[in-house]
A protein has these predicted regions:
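C-terminal helical subdomain
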Residues: 102-106, 121-169
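Substrate-binding pocket helix/loop in short-chain dehydrogenase/reductase
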Residues: 17-19, 26-28
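Active-site loop immediately N-terminal to the catalytic Tyr-X3-Lys motif
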Residues: 20, 69-73
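Active-site helix of classical SDR
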Residues: 42, 78-81
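A short, exposed helix-loop element centered on a Lys and neighboring polar residues
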Residues: 42-43, 87
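Residue(s) in the substrate-gating loop at a strand-loop-helix junction
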Residues: 62
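Alpha-helical segment proximal to the catalytic Tyr-Lys
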Residues: 47, 91-94
């Protein structure tokens, strides 16, 4: 069974509480999903990616891997750790036939906010109010671009946001 590409798309957030009110179960879930999920898949498939002679690992982190925002410490800390795992692996695999790319999206309209807010559709919809967010197809197109580069080309990192978003917490429609 040959494996050429691994897309680590492990992600998710639960809650938006300040650190002083952190829900430890939410934090545990976010770290288990974002960090350990990425680690498990990478460890499991790395030998096959190396054996392919031209493997590619794409890790979907987030702009939250570089930024912080009020109430987001559980998610941003997990995404910082996921990014650190990916960037560390980049150095550890030097000389091996595996390329690594980190894609850090901003606001992408998926079920992310619905999960974060425990199924509260109104609260989830409000996240994207007044802006045009990215959609999953935007990220898929970037993955396709990265995967189509020649084997000697490594695209280390791509940050992609909607035009309406400048930082994790600064965007059109949010006062």
């Amino acid at each position: 069974d040959r494996v050429d590409v691994l897309v680590n798309n492990a992600g998710g957030a639960k809650g938006l509480e300040p650190v002083a009110e952190a829900d430890l179960e939410h934090w545990r879930w976010m770290w288990e999903t974002n960090v350990l999920g990425t680690l498990r898949m990478t460890r499991a498939l790395l030998p096959k990616l190396i054996a392919s002679g031209d493997g590619l690992i794409v890790t979907i982190t987030s702009v939250a891997a570089f930024e912080v925002y009020d109430g987001g410490a559980g998610y941003t800390s997990a995404k910082h750790a996921q990014g650190a795992l990916h960037r560390t692996l980049r150095g550890e695999l030097l000389g091996k036939p595996v390329r690594l790319t980190e894609i850090a999206p901003g606001a992408v309209e998926t079920e992310f906010s619905l999960v974060r807010f425990g199924g509260d559709q109104q609260r989830a919809d409000a996240v994207y109010e007044g802006m045009t967010p990215l959609v999953a197809a935007d990220i898929a197109e970037v993955i396709g671009f990265v995967a189509s580069r020649p084997s000697h080309v490594n695209v280390d990192q791509i940050v992609i946001r909607p035009r309406d978003q400048a930082t994790a917490s600064r965007r059109v429609g949010r006062s």
